[in-house]
Regions:
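Conserved hydrophobic position(s) of the canonical leucine-rich repeat
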Residues: 3, 14, 25, 34, ...
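Acidic/polar low-complexity surface segments
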Residues: 20-28
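Intrinsically disordered, low-complexity polyampholyte segments enriched for Lys and acidic residues
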Residues: 23, 64, 78, 85, ...
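Inter-repeat linker/turn residues at the boundaries of leucine-rich repeats
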Residues: 1, 9-12, 32, 40-43, ...
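Periodic glycine anchor positions in long extracellular repeat architectures
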Residues: 20, 51, 64, 85-88, ...
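Conserved hydrophobic beta-strand positions in leucine-rich repeat
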Residues: 6, 17, 37-40, 48, ...
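Low-complexity basic/metal-binding stretches
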Residues: 219-233, 237-257
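N-linked glycosylation sites
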Residues: 26, 85-86, 105
């Protein structure tokens, strides 16, 4: 469709909005050339999904539940799920969202958002599941996850965050599953971690690449701080890795950091 702008407003009973489709359907490339999207006064909307190649030419996305902002005004007070299917918003360069107080699930598909340079998740009090597909967010230099009190699952697919230099995983008290695929974060130079109570971390799956990068950072002169909250207190904060510090960590968390 050649439409350059799309506005959906004043639909009080709309609960699910799916624009485009996944790879198994025929109506892909929806609003491929659309550069402006307006979603206003959709008070009942709970699920927002963008399909394959949807909004391919859009360069900025602002999801703010209580504000009209930029070229993507959004008023979605009850939104609980956001999904970007494969290759949707592939030209996106700027991503901002806030006030999404009910969102529990965010899914970013394969090859999405490869031009975005910064990504932050810090205003999602109900977020429980955050997943990234393969080959996505490859140009993100700074990745921040902060103050996500309900986040339980983080999943990152192969070859994603290829150019990421700095990461913050801070104040994530209930994370229980942390999965990192192959060749993820190969460029990391600084990691700041505080992934919650160790007893809650029941499943940690990381690739050899990520383990190697973490080990190199720990043993180099880079400014590296690993924070770990255990029994309600900070267990350790060290500039460089040491065998003693490694042994002091609970087993599940050790596997997240070293081969």
């Amino acid at each position: 469709m050649e439409t350059s702008s799309l506005c959906l407003s004043d639909l009080p009973s709309l609960t699910d909005l799916i624009i485009g489709s996944d790879e198994n359907c025929n109506n892909s490339y929806s609003f491929y050339c659309c550069k402006k999207l307006e979603l206003v006064n959709l008070p009942a909307l709970q699920t927002l999904e963008f399909g394959l190649f949807a909004f391919h030419l859009a360069s900025a996305l602002h999801l703010k539940s209580d504000l009209r902002f930029g070229s993507f005004p959004v008023d979605l007070p009850n939104l609980i799920s956001v999904s970007f299917n494969n290759t949707s918003f592939s030209k996106l360069q700027s991503l901002e969202w806030s006030g999404m107080t009910h969102v529990a699930n965010i899914s970013i598909g394969n090859r999405c958002m490869n031009l975005v340079s910064e990504m932050e998740f810090s205003d999602f009090p109900c977020l429980e599941h955050l997943s990234f597909g393969s080959d996505c967010c490859r140009n993100v230099k700074d990745l921040k996850m902060r103050g996500l009190g309900q986040l339980r699952v983080i999943s990152i697919g192969d070859h994603s965050f290829y150019k990421t230099l700095h990461t913050d995983f801070v104040e994530l008290p209930v994370v229980s599953t942390f999965t990192v695929g192959k060749k993820v974060f190969p460029s990391l130079v600084r990691v700041n971690m505080e992934c919650g109570v160790a007893a809650a971390v029941s499943r940690v799956v990381v690739s050899d690449t990520f383990r190697s990068v973490m080990t190199n950072i720990c043993n180099s002169n880079s400014c590296f701080c690993l924070f770990h909250r255990y029994a309600g207190s900070i267990l350790a904060c060290q500039r460089k890795w040491s065998p003693t510090f490694h042994r002091s960590l609970p087993r599940a968390f050790r596997h997240c950091c070293l081969p």
